[in-house]
Amino acid sequence: FMSGHLVVEAFDEGGNIIAYRQTDNEVVDDGEQCILKMLFATPQTSNSGRGEYTSTGACTGTLTGAWTNIAIGTGTTAAADTQVVLVNETSSTGGLERGPATTMTWTNGTGADSTKIVLSRTFTSDSLTAHTISESGLFNSTVGDANGMLARQAFTGVALSTGDSITITWTFTVGN
């Protein structure tokens, strides 16, 4: 059993909190299929790292690494299992581009305790244009036009002006 949670915190230039959101996230079909293929991969196959199974419709992109890259966007479409990219990623917007998590914390569970990982990244806007951030995704690549999305979630928009920052925190729990 895998569950996920997303926390969004926004701050103005002075460090004052201007928005807080939290919600469960949507692990998309691509992510679910890729997780299983990576777990049960056979290294001697041509699809090394993706298992030896034929992919149709999901997990067809190259698995270039762990899902540690966080992206944000302005799309407002609800999260859906079939999505493979953000609706409108801020891939070329000053300070709001996709990048690796700057904090990753593992908790190893035993017995009744769950195992989890918490990944977060802070984006600081240096754009002269205001943006309303309303979606985030977790990817296995820093390339903005690549697939490889594990999870996505939309949330009530957070308006950012120059100097404002937004911290995205993804938590994934496996087990109990």
Predicted regions and their residues:
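Small cysteine-rich, disulfide-bonded extracellular modules of the LU/uPAR three-finger superfamily
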Residues: 1-134, 141-176
